[in-house]
Every structure is written in structure tokens, then in C-alpha cells.
């Protein structure tokens, strides 16, 4: 039996609007794994996943939140965009890249209409990607805002 957080997260796992956003993020960034994750102070749960690199994660799967950069986003509320972990002075020593095998990374906070933090729109790839630029975060934040709007509408209708 699913607990309340897992059950609520599972409701979003087949939303076609969210799926379309994941596909757009993958196309725009070249990233092979894109997901919406429900992130709390104790949990990281995959809500919906587009996995083109055989990362091996499915909706409902969980990671230990303390091992994720998404946890840093939950704490700070700031987006993180990394072209190449090995040359990024802030993130090269973080345990997540080695643990999960990625070189490039994106994570954006998903803030619901009521102002609460839901989780993140995140993407990883085993190869470095050119992601950092003046338009990157604003463009990707619009995707996160679209996800937030969908999740907020679903919360109102359920």
C-alpha cells in the first residue's frame, strides 16, 4: 500500500502534458534522462520519467534524498545547471555525479500555485552538454512553471 506522498505522486505519472514537457526539455537540452521528482526533506520520488539513456528509473522509484542535488534545490529554491561536472568548481566534488554517473545536470524548482515547493524538473546525461547561457535558466524555468501549473490544476480537481 502506498503512503499519501507516494500515492499523490503516482497520480501524475501518466499525465500527457507533463510527458510532453519532458520530451521538450530533452529535445532542447540534448539530455538523455529527464524527470519530474517529488522532493521532500526525507524523500525523492520519481513522478514521471523520460529515460533515453537506460538510467533505469521508473515512476514511483525513489532515491535517498540526501544523495541528490535536488535536495540542494529544495533547500535553496535555486536552479542548478551544470555543463560538465568535472570542470565545475562548485559541483565537481559533490557525491551525486559519481554515484549516479552523470556529467551534465539540470534541476529547477517546481513551485505550486499556493507557493509550496513540490519538487524538481531535473535532467542528467552521462556526457557533458552545453547548457549554461543567458537564456537557459529562464527558458527551463518556463518548463518548470508549466509543470507546476499542471500539478496545481490536478490538485484542485482531485
Q: What does each model-identified segment do?
A:
Residues 121-130:
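Short beta-strand-to-loop transition segments that serve as allosteric relay/switch motifs
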Amino acid at each position: 500500500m502506498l503512503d499519501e506522498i507516494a500515492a499523490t505522486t503516482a497520480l501524475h505519472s501518466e499525465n500527457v502534458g507533463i510527458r510532453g514537457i519532458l520530451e521538450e526539455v530533452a529535445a532542447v537540452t540534448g539530455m538523455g534522462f529527464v524527470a519530474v521528482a517529488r522532493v521532500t526533506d526525507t524523500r525523492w520520488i520519481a513522478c514521471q520519467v523520460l529515460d533515453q539513456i537506460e538510467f533505469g528509473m521508473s515512476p514511483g522509484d525513489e532515491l535517498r534524498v540526501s544523495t541528490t542535488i535536488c535536495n540542494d534545490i529544495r533547500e535553496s529554491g535555486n536552479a542548478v545547471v551544470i555543463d560538465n561536472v568535472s570542470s565545475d568548481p562548485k559541483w565537481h566534488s559533490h557525491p551525486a555525479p559519481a554515484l549516479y554517473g552523470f556529467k551534465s545536470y539540470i534541476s529547477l524548482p517546481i513551485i505550486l500555485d499556493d507557493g509550496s515547493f513540490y519538487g524538481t524538473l531535473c535532467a542528467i546525461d552521462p556526457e557533458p552538454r552545453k547548457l549554461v547561457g543567458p537564456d537557459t535558466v529562464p527558458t527551463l524555468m518556463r518548463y518548470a512553471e508549466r509543470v507546476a501549473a499542471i500539478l496545481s490544476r490536478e490538485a484542485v480537481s482531485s
